[in-house]
Amino acid sequence: MFLRAVVLTLALVAVTGARAEVSPDQVATVVWDYFSQLSNNAKEAVEHLQQSELTQQLNALFQDKLGQVNTYADNLQKKLVPFATELHERLTKDSEKLKEEIRKELEELRARLLPHANEVSQKIGDNVRELQQRLGPYADELRTQVNTHAEHLRRHLTSHAQRMEAVLRENVDNLQSSLTPYADEFKAKIDRNIEELKGHLTPYADELKVKIDQNVEELRRSLAPYAQDVQEKLNHQLEGLAFQMKKNAEELKAKITANADELRQRLAPVVEDVRGKLRDNAKGLQESLAQLNSHLDRQVEEFRHNMGPYGDTFNRALVQQVEELRQKLGSYAGGMEDHLSFLEKDLRDKVNSFFSTLKEKENQDMPLALPEQEQAPGPLES
């Protein structure tokens, strides 16, 4: 069953990665995904999870991955799966309730802002234009950096391949001993250059989050005079907007990382082919090296092509989200699933809090405990 696999994965990720500081966002994504995908079958799936079979499988999994289960891992195992199950139960129970609360919140906001509808629409429009002006240079800079660092990677790797060709010409009678160190170094160079590429490009997502916070705060200040007695409700909607916009920034970072890792994977087979030909004749190896050069050019160009639109696509997504807020605060009633972003935000906040508690308890060398574990699950706060 899908949910069983997800929670097994959740436990494995947390346990095997606990010492490597696994990201709470990674765990929250797993929980949110199974909440989203299971839909109407969630209740039955959660009940199935609580059967003894799950405990047996998790015990076997922990033993397989960790050998002797230490106290920390054992406590984590006992806390994580119930926590994930409880979160899912809360999500399932509170989804419709929150949906109604958001509907009422928007109704009150629209009623309060209605006398100033034109001014509110104008302020949001101004904010959209400021957002476009802020983000435009980032899209251009990202594209420039992609081209610059991809070209640097291509030149660096091509230079190494050319050195291998030169060594081949000079050591035809002793290929394996002469070229094996170069082949090993080439693979290491690919890994280093890919990591450097990611290191140069992924910080853009964090910079964009800062711009998002600035833009949303300016929007809040510009709308505050029109929402004096419903400021808390406006703030809540703007928090939801910022959350959605930052999700786009995280997705941009994930796409950059995924494309860089895919480039690494596409280069690996040709490098392995060269290594495999070290035992063969010089002609076969020379052909493999020639293929390596052309393969490098082709794969780096494909990487640049794939990355090219990401900045502009990100900008359009953010502008669209601000425009959707303008529609929700106007006559448009809003989408049927507006509440889901708030539900997901609350989920991620709770997972972050849970992991903070785990870390604090571990640092204090105290038994792990889920806050309010003995109390009945309460509703997600909106």
Swiss-Prot record:
Function: May have a role in chylomicrons and VLDL secretion and catabolism. Required for efficient activation of lipoprotein lipase by ApoC-II; potent activator of LCAT. Apoa-IV is a major component of HDL and chylomicrons.
Chain residue ranges for the region called Disordered: 362-382
Family: Belongs to the apolipoprotein A1/A4/E family.
Protein name: Apolipoprotein A-IV
Primary gene name: APOA4
Molecular function as annotated in GO: cholesterol transfer activity; phosphatidylcholine-sterol O-acyltransferase activator activity; phospholipid binding
One Pfam match: Apolipoprotein
Extent of the Sequence repeats: 33-54, 60-81, 82-103, 115-136, 137-158, 159-180, 181-202, 203-224, 225-246, 247-268, 269-286, 287-308, 309-330
Complexes and interactors: Homodimer.
GO cellular component term of the entry, any: chylomicron
Any GO BP annotation: phospholipid efflux
Region annotated 13 X 22 AA approximate tandem repeats, chain positions: 33-330
Gene3D superfamilies: Apolipoprotein
Keywords: Chylomicron, HDL, Lipid transport, Repeat, Secreted, Signal, Transport
Record's subcellular location: Secreted
Organism: Acinonyx jubatus
Signal peptide: 1-20
Repeat found in the keyword field: yes
InterPro entries for the chain: ApoA_E, Apolipoprotein_A1/A4/E
Record text about domains: Nine of the thirteen 22-amino acid tandem repeats (each 22-mer is actually a tandem array of two, A and B, related 11-mers) occurring in this sequence are predicted to be highly alpha-helical, and many of these helices are amphipathic. They may therefore serve as lipid-binding domains with lecithin:cholesterol acyltransferase (LCAT) activating abilities.
